[in-house]
Amino acid sequence: MDEGMEISSEGNSLIKAVHQSRLRLTRLLLEGGAYINESNDRGETPLMIACKTKHVDHQSVSKAKMVKYLLENNADPNIQDKSGKTALMHACLEKAGPEVVSLLLKSGADLSLQDHSSYSALVYAINSEDTETLKVLLSACKAKGKEVIIITTAKLPCGKHTTKQYLNMPPVDIDGCHSPATCTTPSEIDIKTASSPLSHSSETELTLFGFKDLELAGSNDDTWDPGSPVRKPALAPKGPKLPHAPPWVKSPPLLMHQNRVASLQEELQDITPEEELSYKTNGLALSKRFITRHQSIDVKDTAHLLRAFDQASSRKMSYDEINCQSYLSEGNQQCIEVPVDQDPDSNQTIFASTLRSIVQKRNLGANHYSSDSQLSAGLTPPTSEDGKALIGKKKILSPSPSQLSESKELLENIPPGPLSRRNHAVLERRGSGAFPLDHSVTQTRQGFLPPLNVNSHPPISDINVNNKICSLLSCGQKVLMPTVPIFPKEFKSKKMLLRRQSLQTEQIKQLVNF
């Protein structure tokens, strides 16, 4: 059905008379009491119908004459229909001409009103390509002191330009803009983090905000206005990515561990083999051992121990780091059992020298302990059973050449390997000699400290070496050294001799010069 027949067939008689441009009939209806702003089913008033009608016959009048008559009879130009359009919008959309638009503006039509599609009369005037009407609208805006910026963008499928009105914004290029029907939402905005300020690559020209759906044909232009919110800047040519990445991105835990190991190797380059040997010996002799003092007469040995502790702490290097260096220098090899017949020279020298030093300290403490004459003079004579036990113990302590040779062979045949840090050997201080007590050494005393006539080389007996213990030592597992009790078993049944002023001045001088 034709639009004219549709309009004329609906609504009241006043709307039908205005649609047919019958001025005389319209006058009669208004004088007869018809309401001039009465609307039809779509919300259109007689003034809107007068602006959009195209009906022409021999009895019709011009649009301007009909609009002028309706405005003179108090028609409201700012009433909106159900789609939000006013009479001014209909006049611009249907190309009613600059004369009709001027009449509406003079009657108080509002240029700032928008329909439900957010289009104003200016947008419809530009989309209809009516230059004269647009000039009238712009002149009206300037007369009211308003500056309007309108940007014509792409064309509709029918060939008409789509227009978006921007207020208080600088214009942008036509090719890079969007259709007015679709506005950018916050979800369509890409927030990009800025690159490092020290970077001088072309990627620093990107802004912090970009739009996802605005990549049109104009995205390859060289010029871009930074004030436009809808134009995505042209991307710089792809090149090598920046090396200034955050350290937590390119540094996994494995890489951090490798860097730490590399720095440890650099710190350990200046250490000589002699220093490394001394560190391992100190770590073996001084790691977590308990020291018990029974006399307070040793002056030199205390200073020696203090110097040893200071030397171990001044290097700021733990036994674990030494093991880490040796582990890395071997190429991360796995733990291998070392049989008795294999003798690596370096590790054997370390282990043998450590045991020799322990034996020397044991002998030194035994000799010094036997030099105390006050103990031998003040002791009660032992009973017959105790005397027999003491004689037996002295026999055990007296070394024989065969036992000494066997102990030397055992020291040479013990396989090398990194000892555990947790060998809880107990250092017992008796006199000025500090030596570890061991279950493997059958050396026992009575509770009241008898004098000992001990040879300088006590035997080391009951030491059995097998491949299993060697493998445990070579793998660095926890092997606890067996220890004898500090006090003998007979201590509970006997009283300890309390010493009072057991040293003379000459003996103290001898001990200091020892």
Curated annotation (Swiss-Prot):
The modification Phosphothreonine is found at residue 272. Residues 220-249 are annotated as: Disordered. InterPro entries: AN34A/B/C, Ankyrin_rpt, Ankyrin_rpt-contain_sf. Phosphorylated. ANK repeats lie at residues 9-38, 42-79, 83-113, 117-146. It is found in: Cytoplasm; Nucleus. The keyword Lyase does not apply. The modification Phosphoserine is found at residues 263, 296. GO terms for cellular component: nucleus; pi-body. Keywords: ANK repeat, Cytoplasm, Nucleus, Phosphoprotein, Repeat. PANTHER family: ANK_REP_REGION DOMAIN-CONTAINING PROTEIN, ANKYRIN REPEAT DOMAIN-CONTAINING PROTEIN 34B. Belongs to the ANKRD34 family. This is Ankyrin repeat domain-containing protein 34B. It comes from Homo sapiens (Human). The gene is ANKRD34B.
